[in-house]
Amino acid sequence: MAKLRIIPLGGLGEVGKNMTAFEFGDDIVVVDCGSIFPRADMLGIDLVIPDITYLERNRERVRAYLFTHGHEDHIGATPYVLPRVPAPVYGTKLTCALIRGKLAEHNIGNIQFHIVKPKDVIQAGAFSVQFIKVSHSIAGAVAMALTCPGDFKIDYTPIDGEVTDLNTLAAWGSRGVLAMLAESTNVERPGYTMSEKKIGETFHNLFKDAKGRIIIAMFASNLHRIQQVVDNCIEFGRKICFVGRSMVNVTKLAMEIGELKIPQDVFIDVGDLDCYADSEIVVLTTGSQGEPMSGLTRMANSEHRKLQIRQRDTVIISATPIPGNEIMVSRIIDQLYRCGANVIYNRIADVHVSGHACQEELKLMHTLVKPKYFIPVHGEYRMLHRHAQLAQELGMPEDNVIILEMGQALELSEDEANITGPIPTGSVMVDGLGVGDVGNVVLRDRKHLSQDGLIIVVVGVNKETGQVTSGPELISRGFVYVRENEELISGARNVAMNVLQRYDRIEQSDWTSVKNGIKDEMHNYLFDLIKRNPMILPIIMET
């Protein structure tokens, strides 16, 4: 009998980039295909996606992509992965619509989509998959129960909230679940996740008290929260408009498929704002993470063509900063206050709730599903470790709780669990149209350039005689202001000249040693004088 293999390709030791392959015999199904924001030291990088080398090597065996929901950390890599390893896509209506939109932006077609509903069962190779309703901060979220020959069962469960289909999960627990993978994002938080309805109550009070415009920044995918904003607009006689590309695109798509309901007389275009009093306006915008090009940031910096923040505006930031974005969000809040706005954010009012399960909800999931093995996923390593502890506190044997690292695979049978590998995994960086062509060496050079700048040393050498015909000329970028540091630049030029004068003639075979000599001696000269280490790039041209 073949064994079941669980192969994490992302989402372990990190929050984001979620992707897991399940393999049985000749069949592979992939759950989610997400991206993650680049770290601060990944200069110039737009997006980070999983390494799919393993899937590419086994392209003919991939039977399906199964999606839990439509957040970027679960679908963001689809335009880069699906063309390289095509297979049918299964997801709920909104999830499939969001993926279609992403593929259309990249002019990608010929992907089969299958829309599923909770309790649907599909067959993908050896796997039978049941979709189970769960609550999350986006519509159309589902868990999955995977069954394969030999009565192996996997419950892939990003659980959230109180409207999760607990009956179905409990039924699976009664039948016997071999292993459960459950998210770990909020495992450090005791208690329960606050209900999304609480946000609606806060919005109601803020709408009641606001005298001027209300500007709300949130994630465009949080359609339940957007609907609560719309409902308050209707109650208080306000009009709503959307600002920011993703906000406009997602809400338009959601209205088309019936996931968002906005009366025609409530919705207005941003160009029509001047036709209404401030007390009649609500603006829903991107920018809850302080992104430099987002709608809220451009408004705060008076860079938006049609909207600027002004006195009496109430600005609500209905999100918490993603780790790494705290400084950007703080700067935007400061700037909003400088503009005279009344700023409401989660530290001073309940304007955001998490979409992830806290400890008591996780305990309930473990109690209902009763898996033989447990594998914590979707979290940084400390979160995975804490979730493993929680499972043991609930009575699961230590040997049956398995924390996987990237690059490892887990082989499961009814009798044993073994960690195998290595599996090629990691991060692939997307920079513009380039995918995977930027690595650590390029990032190191970018970091060097960003810290100390660049000096280019240009030397002309006669092809026949090997004599220096021009230069050395120094071109500086991001190092010092040349007009105010002419003595320093002149000294650096003399250092380069001294290196060149050691050669009676410069042959092509000497170029490497000449360049290295210029770099080393100019580095020593500049560091001794001003304690800086610019990137030095000598260029020798034949004349």
Regions found by a protein language model. Give the residues of each.
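A glycine- and charged-residue-rich anion-binding loop/surface
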Residues: 12, 36-40, 61, 345-348, ...
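C-terminal tails and terminal domains of large nucleic-acid-associated
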Residues: 507-543
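Conserved hydrophobic residues forming the short capping helix/wall of the S-adenosyl-L-methionine
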Residues: 103, 391, 526
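His/Asp/Glu-rich metal-coordinating catalytic cores
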Residues: 2-66, 71-276, 294-308, 327-331
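Short Gly/Ser/Thr- and Asp/Glu-enriched loop/turn motifs at secondary-structure junctions
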Residues: 117, 405, 532-536
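RNA-binding accessory domains that recognize and position tRNA/RNA substrates
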Residues: 1-5, 481, 511, 515
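Hard-cation-handling environments
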Residues: 189-318, 322-491, 495-507, 515
